[in-house]
Amino acid sequence: MAKKSMINRELKREKMVAKYADKRIKLKETISDMTASDETRMEAMLELQALPRNASPVRLRNRCAITGRPHGYFRKFGLSRNMLRERVMQGDVPGVRKASW
């Protein structure tokens, strides 16, 4: 089980990314717009750098919904491999079962 502080930190980052998403997109469009003046592009670059670091989606880490484990994460289920196996064995994940051939 991951520390509560790590799980909360990740939740805080998710909120921050959602909060600044539109602003980041607009600034990035301005920066990549070659028809805009160099001065405008430079201002947009400085504005983007002034945003909080945690507003960047690159800093997000996928974590298990139950344990908060960051490794062995299955995107399709939102669970780590350990919890996924446990849930499948209990029959909690529809359409998934243990392989047998």
Curated annotation (Swiss-Prot):
Gene3D superfamilies, per this entry?
1.10.287.1480
Which Gene Ontology terms describe the biological processes this protein takes part in?
Answer: translation
Q: Name one GO molecular function term.
A: structural constituent of ribosome
| Record PROSITE patterns | RIBOSOMAL_S14
Q: Which GO terms describe its cellular component?
A: cytoplasm; small ribosomal subunit
**Keywords assigned by UniProt?**
Ribonucleoprotein, Ribosomal protein, RNA-binding, rRNA-binding
> What is an example of a Pfam family matching this protein?
Ribosomal_S14
Q: Tell me how this protein assembles.
A: Part of the 30S ribosomal subunit. Contacts proteins S3 and S10.
Q: What family does this belong to?
A: Belongs to the universal ribosomal protein uS14 family.
Query: Which PANTHER family does the UniProt entry name for this protein?
Result: 30S RIBOSOMAL PROTEIN S14, SMALL RIBOSOMAL SUBUNIT PROTEIN US14M
The record's function comment reads: Binds 16S rRNA, required for the assembly of 30S particles and may also be responsible for determining the conformation of the 16S rRNA at the A site.
Full protein name: Small ribosomal subunit protein uS14
Species the sequence originates in: Psychrobacter arcticus (strain DSM 17307 / VKM B-2377 / 273-4)
